């Protein structure tokens, strides 16, 4: 979903950078965030720290994870938006296919994004748990 249907880079970048700042690390750029997305929250944290060539204990990374998640779950769809043309594409595909979404984002957050983006209407009802 993220990176294919929804441009969520800005919301992920904000959550990531707030987390890095909170724990005393340097933030990353919009360009750099592209290389960390797709591995989940812990993957984002690990890659962000690796970019800076710094190490953190597992306990520190867990604290960062919880901080990131507590912010992100409240701000999962602030700057995110469907990519141009996605709604029209889904509308056309919906006529001949049953559509579903696969995401490594938590189910609860996926549902919020689908609802707020107005993409839920294009999915097969059985695919939205």
Each predicted region: which residue ranges?
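Alpha-helical substrate-recognition element adjacent to the catalytic core
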Residues: 22-52, 58
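Substrate-recognition element of Asp-dependent hydrolases with the DxDx(T/V) motif
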Residues: 86-114
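Hydrophobic alpha-helical core bundles mediating ligand binding, dimerization, or RNAP-core interactions
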Residues: 16, 20, 37, 41-45, ...
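Active-site neighborhood of HAD-like aspartate-dependent phosphohydrolases
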Residues: 1-35
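Conserved H-loop
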Residues: 26, 55, 119-124
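Conserved small/polar residues in nucleotide/adenosyl-binding loops
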Residues: 128-129
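Short beta->alpha linker loops
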Residues: 36, 40, 81-85, 105
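Metal-dependent phosphoesterase signature
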Residues: 50-87
């Amino acid at each position: 979903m993220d990176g294919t249907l929804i441009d969520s880079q800005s919301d992920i970048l904000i959550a990531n950078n707030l987390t890095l700042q909170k724990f005393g690390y340097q933030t990353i750029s919009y360009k750099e965030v592209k290389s960390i997305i797709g591995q989940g929250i812990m993957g984002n944290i690990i890659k962000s720290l690796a970019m800076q060539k710094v190490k953190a204990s597992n306990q520190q990374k867990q604290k960062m994870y919880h901080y990131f998640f507590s912010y992100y779950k409240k701000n999962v769809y602030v700057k995110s938006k469907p990519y141009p043309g996605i709604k029209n594409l889904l509308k056309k595909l919906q006529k001949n296919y049953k559509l579903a979404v696969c995401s490594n984002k938590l189910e609860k957050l996926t549902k919020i994004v689908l609802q707020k983006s107005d993409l839920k209407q294009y999915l097969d009802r059985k695919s939205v748990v």
